[in-house]
């Protein structure tokens, strides 16, 4: 029975471990990095198996502390080695060039893993902060939408009230306009009235003038003498007393009350002689034309 070497056993373990890790969803770069790390470990064990005798090939050869520190310093300066530098560094540390190459490969793999973990932590923190800000902004947006809906409802209510007030004011203005359209002055009333007795109203207004008295007499003599006396007294009293003003309201009331009277009363009575005194000849028995010319 052929005994399996340590390199064959490690190759089998590494292949199964990579097969188990592949379904986890690592990226292609990370997967290739892990494969390089496994290859470096295989190379180290092969080297140890070839240079150790009597069962010591199964043990992994470890580097000294000073060798590890020297390799770390060189790695910080440059993580990849050229063939000439690799040979020189191996001679300085007392190692094989293959050992130095394997150590640098493993160190690069660990460094990449740490960088990925660091980047993941930074991205995770940024994601958490953005999620927190998003939640706060969404809450603020909801509160603002509620306030906007309340303000809209309030504005709509105020507009309805203003419309109602405008309607009521328009109705009041129409009522006031209707009342104003009624003729209030005497001239407007006379213009719009039909069948009005203007002569009777004129004679009645003459009676309202100051110091104008109508003397009732049975003959034309008394009418003429009273007219002369009234003219003299009115001229004297007109200088002493101011004329009485007749307002439109009293005139309108007077005209309305006089419209219902009978128009035939205009020619009846003895008062008509004062109005038609200019048309009638004087009937004085003591007056004669011969006396006037003598």
Swiss-Prot record:
Known tissue expression: Widely expressed with a lower level in siliques.
List where Polar residues composition bias occurs: 1-20, 219-238
Q: Which domain of life is it from?
A: Eukaryota
TM spans (from-to):
none
Gene3D superfamilies for the chain: Homeodomain-like
GO MF annotations in UniProt: DNA-binding transcription factor activity; DNA-binding transcription factor activity, RNA polymerase II-specific; sequence-specific DNA binding; transcription cis-regulatory region binding
Q: What is one cellular component GO term in this UniProt entry? A: nucleus
Q: Where in the cell is it found?
A: Nucleus
Q: Does the keyword Transcription regulation apply?
A: yes
Q: What is its main location?
A: nucleus
- Outline what the protein does: Probable transcription factor that may function as a negative regulator of the flowering time response to photoperiod. May act to repress cell expansion during plant development.
The UniProt entry, under PANTHER family, shows: HOMEOBOX-LEUCINE ZIPPER PROTEIN, HOMEOBOX-LEUCINE ZIPPER PROTEIN ATHB-16
**UniProt name for this protein:** Homeobox-leucine zipper protein ATHB-16
Organism equals Arabidopsis thaliana (Mouse-ear cress)
Upper lineage is: Eukaryota, Viridiplantae, Streptophyta, Embryophyta, Tracheophyta
* Gene name of the record: ATHB-16
